[in-house]
Amino acid sequence: MECTTVKLSVALGEEVVQLSTLDQQAQRAYANLLLVFKLSQNADADHVFSSLKRGLGAALTEVPDFASLVVPVPGSKKNELQLRLGPDSGVPFKLVRQDALASHLEKHSSGGTYAELARDNFPLASVPTELLFNQLPASELACARGLPGLLAQASVVDGGLIMGLSWHHTVSDARGINTLLSSWARHTKMWAGQGTIGSPSAAPEPTRDRWRLTCGPRDVHVSHFSDYQINAAARTPLSPAAAHLLDRPDTTNATAGLSTWYFSKKALSSLRGELGRAAADGSDAVQFTSGEAVSALVWKHLSLARLLHQQLAHETSLFASRIDFRGRAKPAFADGYIGNINEPNARTRMRLAEVCAPSSPASLVALAAAVREAIGAMDEKTMREFIGLVEGSSSVTDVYWDYNTFPGPDLVVTDMSGMDTLRQEWGGDLGQPVCIRSGSREKGVAYFLPQDAQGGFEVQLQCTAEDLGRLKDDSLFTKYAEFRS
């Protein structure tokens, strides 16, 4: 095992990055993502590691905010943070060789080799996060005065490599980390093939326009945002003496497993066509997006599998989805914008009697239409009002979701299916990633993972083992969704 810090290939001077209001309000937690590569035969692990380090250094030159230290704003009375950069900025990077990981994988999953993991569709959810991610010890987190914007780990297994990324959500949303990955892949490919990283250049200004997401309207009341609350205690760190760099963990005593399902391009087309015909107005079929159609299917069938309609304590179920506002702002933000721009969530609430009505194309259309309407209502005005709500609160961390997710009836979706992560070319012995997994465990969140080269995508769902058994036996759900792990 080797621990190093990968610095920018072109050093920076001292710089403080002022965060936007949406960055300040964002979750203060590390988001975790896993990429799996199949290594070419006789790949040289040392050469692979060297290429990854060189590529990362060049990528950080282009996207430097991920090399930052997340620190409190001096003297702030509102729990505000900022990013600090300097000549020594970099990303803690752990390199784990094959013999150090194989026995742990054999214990916690289906095997210790790439072939064994691939055979069972990469059941990495059962592997403890500390084995696959470069994590700071709890003792350091409790007393930290600053935290890395990104930590990375590359672990070699027989025939493959598992990349674990943990980034502080204050730095950026998932689209931002995908921008970093795109740059990292490009420069790694160049180094592996040509022995050079070229001439990486600093990020263009539009990708760092955080200042545009400040100064919302005044006197916005929380009642303007259903299913949000002002709660100073909800996110407060467990230790009163700790700087608010990380939120209080949102935990539950209920035991949930994470299952992975695959929607092929053919299945997505079939599902969309079925819903479109059921919703047809005259001779014109309604064209739901894949995200809307899968959201409706998951919302209904996961609720049925969880027997929510039999729980007298709940009458309604909330569906919430994180929205990328880059293209909804005027003028639009650059695709490569680094920062958080996905609040407020799109939200729609329906009676459980309707959500859990027997599944049919018509009943799914009702849910898909509600999801579409909620997403369509999210515009720049709504985002600006949310910024005003946060800025008008006593602390930037006071605004929080008022959701009742697992074991409650509410469902939150993080939809990354539009990202090109699985189609990025890393070159050399790596090629394209063959698998991506969320390593995060946000309570009650369903993850729609990036689309693969064939046009399908995987979905990760949380439920109990008994609920999972019912979902596997659900012929209407498995008509479109293939159980993976």
From Swiss-Prot:
Gene Ontology molecular function: any one: acyltransferase activity, transferring groups other than amino-acyl groups
Organism domain of life: Eukaryota
Pfam families linked to this entry: Transferase
Keyword hit for Translocase: no
Biological or metabolic pathway of the protein: Secondary metabolite biosynthesis
Record flagged with keyword Transferase: yes
Record keywords, A-Z: Acyltransferase, Transferase
Reported biotechnological use: Beauveriolides inhibit selectively the acyl-CoA:cholesterol acyl-transferases (ACATs), leading to blocking the synthesis of cholesteryl esters and decreasing the cholesterol concentration, which suggests that beauveriolides are promising as potential lead compounds for antiatherosclerotic agents. Moreover, this activity correlates with inhibitory activities of beauveriolides in the secretion of amyloid-beta-peptide, which suggests that beauveriolides may be an attractive new candidate for the treatment of Alzheimer's disease.
EC number: 2.3.1.-
InterPro entries reported in the protein's UniProt record: CAT-like_dom_sf (IPR023213), Plant_Fungal_Acyltransferase (IPR050317)
Similarity comment: family membership: Belongs to the plant acyltransferase family.
Role description: Acyltransferase; part of the gene cluster that mediates the biosynthesis of beauveriolides I and III, cyclodepsipeptides acting as inhibitors of the acyl-CoA:cholesterol acyltransferase. The HR-PKS cm3B initiates the biosynthesis of beauveriolides by iteratively catalyzing the formation of the linear polyketide chain. The ATP-dependent acetyl-CoA ligase cm3D converts the polyketide carboxylic acid to a CoA thioester which id shuttled to the first T domain in the NRPS cm3A by the acetyltransferase cm3C.
Protein name per its UniProtKB record: Acyltransferase cm3D
Gene behind this protein: cm3D
